[in-house]
Amino acid sequence: TNRKISDIKGKIHIDIYNFIRNIYAVYNLKTDTLKLDAVADEMLGEKKDDFDWSKVKDILRDKSTASTFCRYCLKDSSLTFRIYERLYSLLEEISKGIGQLLQDVSRMTTGAVVEHYIMKMTVKENEVIPNKPSEFEVQDRLKRINIGAFVYQPSPGMYSDIGIVDFRSLYPSIVISHNICPSTIVHEGGNVAYKDKSQVFGLIPSILLSVLNARIDAKAKLKYEPNNNTLKARVSVLKLIANGFFGYLGYYNARWYCFECAGSILALGREYVNKVIERAEKDGFKVIYADTDSAFISSISKEQMNKLLSDINSTLPSPMELELQGVYRRALFVSAKGKEKGAKKKYALCDQDGNLIVKGFQTVRRDWALIAKETQYEVLRKILVENDVNGALSYVKRVIGDIRSLRVPLDKMAILTRLHKDASSYAQTGRHISAALSSGVKFSAGDTVKYIITKGRPGETVSQRSILFDIAKENNIQYDPEYYINQQVIPSVLQIFEVLGFSEGDITGKKNLSLNDF
């Protein structure tokens, strides 16, 4: 059989892994991998038991040690069940909200959740549910691409007294306020418009309005019952559904697919963010960055931010509203690779309480060694929180010295890469593929390869010098210090220091000499 769902008579089979991968992890988890050990550590604060798989045969042959393996398996089952208990309220609320079985809900994507919710509401409104698109329709839809969301590229540098504003539920608000729906489209001389709400209120905006109102109601109740897990789950599910509508309308396999609607939502989103920028600059403030539904404004006080918000909100249609996301002490934007302009979606902030918020840097990416992530995070913390640039530079030099002296634990040198297909299916052999194939262990799509770069032999490529972390640890194989210094640590901090006027030579102590130095 080709079925991928397990049916157990009299039992509901819930696939927690798929639910976490498709829905929960997208907004809630920071872990680099969805292995049980990592997910349990983040959600429960507890990890799997250690077990030496290389000795499993010997352990099972001896009755006195077989219980070790049993306890290991029991702990895995216990962790999985406790994760399920944490997620049950969320699963139950989605199930009730869209009218589908828990077994099916646990395997759905966000788009499927949104579609089932619309179908449920459509039946209530006595409307006709469109058919699923044919294969030819899907192929035709795939050829059409909308212009993306608005991004105002930042200027690299460090800024102080930054205010961040964002639209509350921007895309859902646009759909409602402009009555955007496949049923309300009006084609006027090649342009697209939408019927006024006074003529007909579209199905999609009416459903969205009910979702937003239900979420407001649930949040209000939650204030009086802060420990009510059902209400917490309901708020999360309604947010998931509301935010999923925009992506759903542009999803090629959707029943209510509407290319024009998705394009209109994006265009109006760009227009409203541009209006915020124009108004802020008109009032004499500098906008340093804007992205999708938010804007970063420098050298502005909280009082000035509140006045700006009030002025802009007075011009917005209901239910659109611009909110103050926060006021921050300092912000740092780095250059895009090989460009003078700043990198998009890559910045770090220090809030009023001294907390560091990092977006887009290696500290939040899975394909860098922990030593690079830790070094970068500490550099950002010293610069933004402590305002100590020289201290940050000294710290990096100490890390480089520790790596060169092999004082850094092997655990911090491990690099994790998730496979998109079976290891044997890759045409080009990258570092992680080489490590996977040379180990003799079978790695499939979705698996995470954990490996290190070793010194190896002269003439070997980096790929040839990559081996699985477990093999390196078991055989006491050393990492290659120069690789981790030059390909991990220095690249992770160089862009930060360059913005502040430092070069790679300032970090390594090896400055390039000019003719004037002789």
Indicate residue ranges for each PLM-predicted region.
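Active-site-proximal helix-loop-helix substrate-binding element of RNase H-like nuclease domains
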Residues: 1-77
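Catalytic nucleotidyl-transfer cores of nucleotide-processing enzymes
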Residues: 1-9, 21-23, 131-132, 136-249, ...
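Low-complexity, acidic/Ser/Thr- and charged residue-rich accessory regions of DNA metabolism proteins
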Residues: 436-518
